[in-house]
Amino acid sequence: MKTARQITLDLLIRMDTQGAYSNIILDHAFTQNDADRRDKAFSAALFYGVLERRMTLDYLIRYYSGIEFDKIKTAVVEILRMGFYQLLFMNSVPDSAAVNESVALCDYCNSTKAKGYVNAILRTFLRNEKQIDYGNLTGEAKLSIEYSCPKWLVKKWNSELGEQRAMQMINSCFGRPPIYARVNTVRYAVDDVIGELESEGISAAKNSLIDACIELANTKGIEQSSAYKKGMFHIQDISSQICCKIAAPMFNETVVDLCSAPGGKTFTCAEIMNDRGRIYSYDLYDGKVSVIANTAKRLGLTIITAAENDATKFNPDIPKADRVICDVPCSGLGVIRRKPEIKWNRAEDNDLPKIQRQILDNASKYLKINGEIVYSTCTIEK
């Protein structure tokens, strides 16, 4: 069985080489490994911590390494990132363990020759009392390294929000966000679901703002729980649930959900409608459509039809709807805390406004008279 650090190293290498999604590969790794709850929690904290603080960690590697950064083996870079992160940000890990376990990882990833190199860098950092020398860096350049936020983003937020609000935004990118779920009220009562989850060691509490919304803790391996397999709930962020509350679909209405995957709004709307009416749930990719269909089946929701569709192109086969939901593609800057890799994968978004407008224009054509559109996006860009 792999150790928590070995699991983390594998995940970070995948992020670096394959451009994977952090939440998806972490969940998959935990279903493939029989690590206990404590090890999974440690691995998740280290994994997300390294992703969040990557710019700071890479600055330290460059500062202490005698080898050019681009010439260091990917696995060794990740080992050093993990080592520096534990030394700086994980007070529960003794310094000696952070160094020794990092050195041991070199054997695990067939980089035995790098053991002395890793050991020397981390121990030199310790001898310097873990101080970060920012040299001549000032202003936005220093903030960028200190808070591990790309300089273009620091500059953008300073310009658009002002320095005080920008600092609040930068700080808000750290730490793991709460995990929320929506109870499948078509089949189960909220209190019964909470009881079932807690009997399996998963903490659950009602949210006071949204009916049937529960906040979860100790969720590692939740997809293996009997509550999950019974279709008692689906994971959905509270902001997404708020969109459904605003949409307020009614019994026997028709709802069209464009850009639907992974389907949270579709499922919640079906539950609000008590599984009475019709929901047409669309996505561009067949694989994502399958995810929607399979989850609807797990939840026992019968009014959902999932299908492929390009939301930027008008489709005359889509029926007229009472509500159309548009969760349009965006830069994702509003969900950095949930997906920290967004900071490092800056996409060219010059076409996004055009794409968003095309989707919105088409959505209006699917509406019945007096129908309503709910338009949402997970960015904060102007």
Language model features with spans:
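S-adenosylmethionine
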Residues: 1-382
